[in-house]
Amino acid sequence: MATNEEFIRTQIFGTVFEITNRYSDLNPVGMGAFGLVCSATDTLTNQQVAIKKIMKPFATAVLAKRTYRELKLLKHLRHENLICLQDIFLSPLEDIYFVTELQGTDLHRLLQTRPLEKQFVQYFHYQILRGLKYVHSAGVVHRDLKPSNILINENCDLKICDFGLARIQDPQMTGYVSTRYYRAPEIMLTWQKYDVEVDIWSAGCIFAEMIEGKPLFPGKDHVHQFSIITDLLGSPPSDVIDTICSENTLKFVTSLPHRDPIPFSERFKTVEPDAVDLLEKMLVFDPKKRITAADALAHPYLAPYHDPTDEPVAEAKFDWHFNDADLPVDTWRVMMYSEILDFHKIGGTDGQIDTSATFDDQVAAATVAAAQAQAHALAQAQMSQNMIDPNQLLNEDGTPVSGSIAENSSNSATTNLNGAAAGMNSASDTINEYANQAVHFANEFQQ
């Protein structure tokens, strides 16, 4: 079993970072979705990596599910223009760390330093759309595409990151998701019935920002955001208005004076015509009339880079069966640990479930594993209090506790009463042993 000596603790922005001794030279690089991100050196590969700490992933069932979703997505989505998961581990404090390649900068920082030359705008836009084609083919909507989620290295290789908000393609999706400047109008107008087209709108806003060096729709609030969109696109067409579900929103939109659109050729007079044409096809009020990522790649503007044989789609749709699940934290914990062990190609560990099984079967197995771990913890607590013979330990049904559990409990009670007493405080301490095993076996596997 892994021990704390395998981890190095340091304070980053007042937050404890606990990493295995495989990684060194930690430096903060920013905050990602729901976590702190640091750069580090991977001593096994001698390469620079980014380590994202997911803080308190098991604090609530909502946080556990969100972390599980991001882990599943990172395992499933493997593409040159998407951030790639290289390692994952759990710390003794039960925080989760995702390790990915380090890109150096992001598009937001790049745009703040200098205007982009035309060839870079073209190449970056191609890579964004190439990544989106793959993501959408997997049945996934990113939902939070913005310049700070577009990572770039010194070779101009671009990768989309932060899938913490990603969701299934679902015509009934609801919520308040992307950063305002890049938010599609259907989200503001309806708050539901949106799909992959929201990413195309966001990519169009990013495209315009790369061209002009400043945000296209810098709204101060929802009303102002909608107003400056209509300044360019004109009033939304009637078929879009008909999809508005909120009565208050409908009253607001229909109360506005009619606005005519400004031709994109006038708004972007100094921009090459092919770029203007593609931008106009991406920034359309009606999401169903917006160009797709696949069709955008074939647009004449991207002809210098377009290669239909090198713009792959996902081999399989992402499995979203867990999306509507309402499970307790301990069940999510077991499922998460099992996914981590599977990532490291480790099998046969106590408490591990089969991640290739159907979701319902995984839930059933994880529920049993969580219950067994709780029983183990209660047995430890019972012995620490009563110092009874481990051979006398009984399950609730009257059957003897298995020998290995009893023996481990006895050893724990006789050699370290304080450690055994900790099991009484929380059954999750025992479940955390699965995490330590995951780290231990992963380290052995990588050496």
Swiss-Prot record:
Active-site residues per Swiss-Prot or TrEMBL entry: 144 (proton acceptor)
One annotated GO molecular function: RNA polymerase II CTD heptapeptide repeat kinase activity
Motif (TXY): 174-176
SUPFAM superfamilies in UniProt: Protein kinase-like (PK-like)
Amino-acid positions noted as binding ATP in the UniProt annotation, renumbered to this chain: 29-37, 52
Chain spans, region Disordered: 394-414
Domain Protein kinase: 23-302
Function recorded in the entry: Proline-directed serine/threonine-protein kinase involved in a signal transduction pathway that is activated by changes in the osmolarity of the extracellular environment. Controls osmotic regulation of transcription of target genes.
PTM annotation, UniProt: Dually phosphorylated on Thr-174 and Tyr-176, which activates the enzyme.
GO biological process: cell adhesion; cellular hyperosmotic response; cellular response to oxidative stress; intracellular iron ion homeostasis; negative regulation of cytoplasmic translational initiation in response to stress; negative regulation of exit from mitosis; negative regulation of G2/M transition of mitotic cell cycle; negative regulation of induction of conjugation with cellular fusion
Regulation: Activated by tyrosine and threonine phosphorylation.
InterPro entries reported in the protein's UniProt record: Kinase-like_dom_sf, MAP_kinase, MAP_kinase_CS, MAPK_p38-like, MAPK_Sty1/Hog1, Prot_kinase_dom, Protein_kinase_ATP_BS, Ser/Thr_kinase_AS
The species this protein was found in: Candida glabrata (strain ATCC 2001 / BCRC 20586 / JCM 3761 / NBRC 0622 / NRRL Y-65 / CBS 138) (Yeast)
Subcellular location: Cytoplasm; Nucleus
Family membership noted in the UniProt record: Belongs to the protein kinase superfamily. Ser/Thr protein kinase family. MAP kinase subfamily. HOG1 sub-subfamily.
Domain notes: The TXY motif contains the threonine and tyrosine residues whose phosphorylation activates the MAP kinases.
Name used for this protein in its record: Mitogen-activated protein kinase HOG1
Gene it is expressed from: HOG1
EC number(s) stated in the UniProt entry for this protein: 2.7.11.24
Bias (Polar residues) ranges: 401-414
Source taxon at top rank: Eukaryota
Modified residues (Phosphothreonine): 174
Primary enzyme class: transferase
Record PTM Phosphotyrosine, positions in chain: 176
